[in-house]
Amino acid sequence: RVIWLLEELEIPYTLVHHQRDPLTRLAPESLRLVHPLAKAPIIVDNGITLCESGAIMEYILNQCVDDILRPQKSSAEYYQYLEWLHFAEGSLSLPVISTLLMSMEQRDGRQALDGYIAKEVQLDFSYIENTLSKRQYFAGDSFSAADIMMTIVLEIAEGLGLLENRDSTKAYLVSMKQRPAYQKAASFG
C-alpha cells in the first residue's frame, strides 16, 4: 500500500527489505531495531518512524501541499474517504485475515469463530459490493488513498474466493490493478 501511494504521488523513496523467518513468518531482529513492534510497513522520514499502513499514508499525504488522493476536508466525500480508509484495517482485515489463517489448518466449521467470521464476511462484502455498484471509487468520483487501503485487502479476499458473485467488487479490483503505480508497486513483490 505504502509503495503504491508513493508511486501514485511520484515521491522518491528507498525500499529496505527485511527477510522474515521462512517457517514462523516472524520479522527479523533487524526490523525490531527500526521500530519496537517489528511490523511492516515502516517509514523513517525526517526523524519520524511510524508503522501501520493507515498512519503512514496519512503522514505521507500530510506532507503534500495539495489534497492529492484524498477529498477536500470540507466535502461529504472526505468522510466517505475516512470511513473506507479505516474500514480496510478496522473492520475488513479481521475476517479476511482470519479466513486466510483458518484455511491453513484443519477445521470442521463448527467452531464459534467460523460462524462469526462467515457472518462478518457476508456483511462486509455486501456493503462493499453495494457501494461499488453505485460508484467507481470508495470515496466518490475520484481515486484516493482509501482505494489503495481497500485494494490490498480485496486482493487477499479474492485469493480466498470471497468475491464470488461480487461483480462490482471484482470489476473494481481489475481496474485498480491496471493503474501504473499499482503495477510498479506490485513488481516489488
Question: Model regions: which residues?
Answer:
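GST-like domain detector, emphasizing the conserved glutathione-binding G-site
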Residues: R1-G115, E129
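Short, solvent-exposed turn/loop segments enriched in Gly/Ser/Thr/Pro and often Arg
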Residues: Q19, A145, G189
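Amphipathic alpha-helical protein-protein interaction surfaces
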Residues: P36, V65, N165, Q178-A181
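Short A/G/S/P-biased low-complexity tracts
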Residues: V44, A181-Y182
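Residue-level recognition of oxygen-bearing side chains
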Residues: A55, S168, A181
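GST-like fold's C-terminal all-alpha helical module
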Residues: L85-Q178
